[in-house]
A protein has these predicted regions:
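Anion-binding alpha/beta catalytic cores of soluble intermediary-metabolism enzymes, centered on
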Residues: 1-280, 285-355
């Protein structure tokens, strides 16, 4: 069974409630209708009365719709916003106005338990979505860095590696170790991570992948250098410092760096560039040194390699909220919702949360 099929099958067993704060967008509405039709999740459409056409389409869909402009829960939402942001200058009037914002209200539904997850960002910016997520939900206990990951589904990856490796053919036992899906992190939240933040990102991505994909995480901290081959630049030192922090904080996590991308993914090259590495040639989580690299890499992989980019999935929040690329199609939104549903702590025993 493919990753996407398995993902939807597991999500369908949860009957998760997923709130959408941009239901007026046709892509979002199409994804929500599909979620309901295929039984993957129960969508909740938070409508915007100012968007007449979008609201009409949402109501016509027959899905559950909530109008925050006349919902009594807005009073509690306004109070929560004011409590969170008054010290930063937010007034009571501003909080009251924001309480009617569909994106804020969708996040509030998760906070209050009226939804298990929320998904936004098809229209609004990551910055807007992150504001509401951090103001209303905040980081999980012990988490200092909230970050994001894309799950890059690359079915042709096995064939590509076989074509580029004398040691790996499509029917080789080693081919089983080549992932169908790669985790790219961070691609949308932390612009220039410090070494502790890189370690946070790697550890959060590994924990999320274990729940979402189900395989053994293998983390490659990427660089233009492999095992110091690029000299002693600050960027290499940063990655190497992050690796030491990972080994201290998560000693059982398979991780290595600094690694060039080809050394992380292609077994033949790894034997020359990083012999003896526990990861090289078998990485399934690629940790980029900064947001420029991560964002560029996922978009190039999506557009040139025809990979399916699912995300950005936020990591490190106390409750599941996911962002979207504004370039996402309905299929990507559908699968982001399925992944986000799987992250809800309601579906895991205490102490076994996905993040």
């Amino acid at each position: 069974m493919s990753f996407l099929s398995d993902l939807c099958e597991r999500a369908s067993k949860l009957d998760a409630r997923v709130a959408f704060g941009e239901s007026g967008d046709p892509r979002v509405l199409d994804a929500a209708i599909r979620l309901e039709r295929e039984g993957v999740a129960h969508p909740i459409l938070v409508i915007d009365p100012a968007d007449g056409a979008g609201t009409a389409a949402a109501r016509k869909s027959g899905l559950e719709c909530i109008d925050p402009s006349n919902d009594p829960r807005c009073e509690a939402l306004a109070a929560a916003l004011l409590a969170s942001r008054a010290k930063h200058g937010m007034t009571a009037d501003e909080a009251a106005k924001l309480s009617h914002d569909p994106l804020a209200f969708a996040t509030w539904l998760v906070k209050t338990g009226d939804a298990d997850a929320s998904v936004g960002g098809a229209v609004r910016t990551t910055r807007e979505l992150m504001h509401f997520a951090l103001w209303l939900i905040g980081p999980a206990n012990g988490v200092k860095t909230v970050s994001s990951a894309f799950y890059m589904v690359v079915p042709p990856f096995r064939a590509a590696l076989a074509a580029n490796s004398s040691q790996l053919s499509s029917d080789s036992p080693q081919a089983d170790s080549v992932p169908e899906v790669l985790t790219f992190t961070d691609c949308s939240v932390v612009p220039n991570p410090t070494a502790p933040q890189l370690a946070d990102i790697a550890i959060a991505a590994a924990a999320a992948r274990k729940k979402i994909v189900g395989d053994e995480p293998r983390v490659a901290l990427l660089s233009y250098s492999s095992k110091g081959s690029g000299g002693t630049s600050p960027s290499i030192a940063l990655v190497q410092s992050a690796l030491q922090l990972i080994r201290t904080r998560a000693p059982n996590l398979i991780a290595d760096g600094d690694l060039q991308a080809d050394a992380a993914l292609i077994p033949d090259i790894s034997t020359r560039k990083s012999p003896g590495s526990p990861v090289a040639g078998r990485a399934n989580i690629l940790v980029f040194p900064n947001l420029d690299a991560g964002n560029i890499a996922y978009k190039l992989t999506e557009r040139l390699a025809h990979a399916k980019a699912i995300g950005p999935i936020l990591q490190g929040l106390a409750m599941p909220v996911s962002d979207l690329s504004r370039g996402a199609d309905a299929d990507a939104i559908f699968h982001v919702a399925a992944i986000t549903a799987l992250q809800s702590a309601r579906f895991y025993p205490s102490g076994d949360q996905p993040l």
